[in-house]
Amino acid sequence: MENFKHLPEPFRIRVIEPVKRTTRAYREEAIIKSGMNPFLLDSEDVFIDLLTDSGTGAVTQSMQAAMMRGDEAYSGSRSYYALAESVKNIFGYQYTIPTHQGRGAEQIYIPVLIKKREQEKGLDRSKMVAFSNYFFDTTQGHSQINGCTVRNVYIKEAFDTGVRYDFKGNFDLEGLERGIEEVGPNNVPYIVATITSNSAGGQPVSLANLKAMYSIAKKYDIPVVMDSARFAENAYFIKQREAEYKDWTIEQITRETYKYADMLAMSAKKDAMVPMGGLLCVKDDSLFDVYTECRTLCVVQEGFPTYGGLEGGAMERLAVGLYDGMNLDWLAYRIAQVQYLVDGLEEIGVVCQQAGGHAAFVDAGKLLPHIPADQFPAQALACELYKVAGIRAVEIGSFLLGRDPKTGKQLPCPAELLRLTIPRATYTQTHMDFIIEAFKHVKENAANIKGLTFTYEPKVLRHFTAKLKEV
């Protein structure tokens, strides 16, 4: 099989979900009713759902079987200890708090780290800034509602869709240290390393870059949180592209990666393959006070610290999913599926970011150059794609990035991208071919696609619930 151009899916499909086909007229009415926002479409009106890979894919038979072991005790569940043991074995982190999903972890750790910096280092809340290679939208949102400005420090290659670079998710290390010096180290409550960098196109971060970033953080005594949603995909790219680690296993690379952070926050709905679940973990006793305070907040916001909003069966499933998501054959297939879609789109003249781990990212700015950034070209493209083929995708651009919370002005976005997110073990190569064909039709009508303007704009995380209309 090593010499075959394309390998089939490395799994057998045992359960299927029927989907309905709709007419163009039906879809046009549905997208207008949604306020030109695919987030607000009903799932039954979607033919191929590429909105997200978060909790939308299939689970393995071992994960499903593990649910039968669930201990639903309110306190001290043995299912919690099974999950905590998986975390120790995989990441080397001693303290585990389960949460209902990634943002559950964020709403706990962010205020705790800000408070710690304020008490121990005299942080000035009016000047505080957190840094990342690129903040995920909810991490940015939770930071901002806690009064913390966020600053993304990424390399110049990150958003240039015309450039191929092995690790486009890397930190701009000089920019990071310069930024810390500018705002004052004591005013930096945390650094977030996002692996892979979702907003840059699912692009990986090298181990060398993570090591250097962590060295800078230790120099200024700033805690590092690893945003770990796609930890296994990042490890796979390291194995493929960082020569020093080509003979390492995914498990070995993962363990090494997590030496270069102090905490991890995870939406387990991605690489751990579960429909619902998250993690907040602390590496060792150096931040035991943070762990203790986070446990206290967990009780109020998520649930008792040994279940954190998850049933026992869900914790058992997650304990297994963390391992299953690191399977090398599975990762090779998943990355190849994304590459196949990107290659097919580029063959028909649709410019994409280089293939990342979980999605194809179409450069909407280049496909729709007549639509200015403040009329959201990638959102307009998402609506057109749905009208043409019933495919739901998501904007990663100015619409998502939002406004400066202090000035109210639209934040400048480095690229206007449309993310075609591939749920795990859900769609076949035939689906990828259909998506490519749909873009042929979209491309033919590109000049007639109109920009969008708000009819309703929430103040925080607007892209989830905003409504728009054509200009």
From Swiss-Prot:
Pfam family, one: Beta_elim_lyase
EC code: 4.1.99.1
GO molecular function: tryptophanase activity
Known pathway: Amino-acid degradation; L-tryptophan degradation via pyruvate pathway; indole and pyruvate from L-tryptophan: step 1/1
Domain of life: Bacteria
N6-(pyridoxal phosphate)lysine sites (modified residues): 270
Modified residues (N6-acetyllysine): 5, 115, 156, 450
Top-level EC class: lyase
Enzymatic reactions: L-tryptophan + H2O = indole + pyruvate + NH4(+)
Keywords, in A-Z order: Acetylation, Lyase, Pyridoxal phosphate, Tryptophan catabolism
Cofactor(s) in the UniProt record: pyridoxal 5'-phosphate
PANTHER family: BETA-ELIMINATING LYASE-LIKE PROTEIN-RELATED, TRYPTOPHANASE
Family as reported in the entry's similarity comment: Belongs to the beta-eliminating lyase family.
HAMAP family named among the record's database cross-references: Tryptophanase
Oligomeric and partner information: Homotetramer.
Protein name according to UniProt: Tryptophanase
